[in-house]
Every structure is written in C-alpha cells, then in structure tokens.
Design a protein with these regions (language model features):
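Short helix-capping/hinge SLiMs at alpha-helix to coil transitions
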Residues: 23-25, 39-42, 57-58
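Non-DNA-binding regulatory cores of transcription-related proteins
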Residues: 76-162
Length: 162
C-alpha cells in the first residue's frame, strides 16, 4: 500500500482496532505503529526493517523482541501476513473488507521491484489444486501461495515504456 493517504491509513487502522476488539484483543500504540509502517511500505519488510522504521519515528526505542511479538500478534489477528519465501511481512489487503475470503492467502511477488499483491483465488482454482494433489494421494492443508513474476510497471520499464 505505498503512497497511502493519511485519511485512508487512519480508516484502515480504525478497522484494525475494531477487528481486534471483536476478537477480545487491543491494538496498542506500539502494535498500531508496527501495522502502520507495514501499511505504508511499498514492499515487504523484515522484522528488523520494521524495527528500524519504528525507532526512527519515536523517541523511545522499541526492542527487537517487542517487534517479533507484535508481528506474531498482528499475524494471529489476520492483520499482516508473513511471506514464507522471504520471511518478510506485509499488511493484509483485506483489513477493511466486509466479505469472506478463502482460507488460503495468495500473493503475487514482483521480482523486479519487490512489490506484493494479495489476491483472491477463485473457488475453482482452489478445487483444481486440491484435485491435482488428490490424484497423487496428497491431502492439501490450508496455506498461502506465493507466485513470483514481473509486475506491469517493471515490464513497462524493461521495454522502455512500450
């Protein structure tokens, strides 16, 4: 969510607070700060990158262990996702959504600029993957799918904007 307007950021953070409250949890100031940094980032961030950004914007240093605990909390609350391939984090693109999403999360990762798009897979696509696994005797468990490629912006840059 790069170049996010302050009003949109505030709205998403309010939605995150409501979501936490519905789950009997609190979005504390530090949790809010970590989530805000992830929402404003144009690419996935490691825990130490989050720590660095948080410590730049405050006078009291946040310990690294706190960032790890906060990221774990935010992941449990379904507000952020950890990308398995890079061990980095992105904010959930569906924080303010009021509709259902499939259990498995799907990400399109750009190899050029490191941008990440969270996408909804169709039920048909999920069923096709389950059927493919079933033919070789594997029962799939819900998990996220990470696919790498080149985004439109990078494709246009590589071809000289043509």
């Amino acid at each position: 969510m790069p170049n996010i307007k302050q009003s949109k950021l505030d709205s998403l953070l309010r939605a995150a607070e409501v979501s936490c409250a519905e789950n009997g949890a609190r979005l504390t100031q530090r949790r809010r700060q970590v989530l805000s940094e992830l929402m404003q980032s144009s690419s996935p961030l490691s825990a130490y990158e989050v720590l660095d950004l948080c410590n730049r914007s405050t006078t009291s240093a946040m310990p690294a262990m706190s960032v790890y605990r906060i990221l774990d909390f935010l992941e449990q609350q379904l507000l952020v996702h950890r990308l398995s391939t890079s061990n980095k984090y992105v904010s959930c693109a569906h924080i303010a959504c009021d509709h259902k999403h499939f259990q498995a999360t799907h990400f399109l990762l750009c190899e050029g600029c490191s941008s990440v798009e969270e996408v909804d897979a169709t039920e048909e696509a999920s069923e096709a993957l389950e059927q493919m696994a079933k033919t070789v005797g594997v029962k799939l468990t819900p998990q996220q799918v990470e696919l790498s490629g080149i985004c439109t912006t990078c494709q246009n840059s590589a071809s000289g904007g043509v």
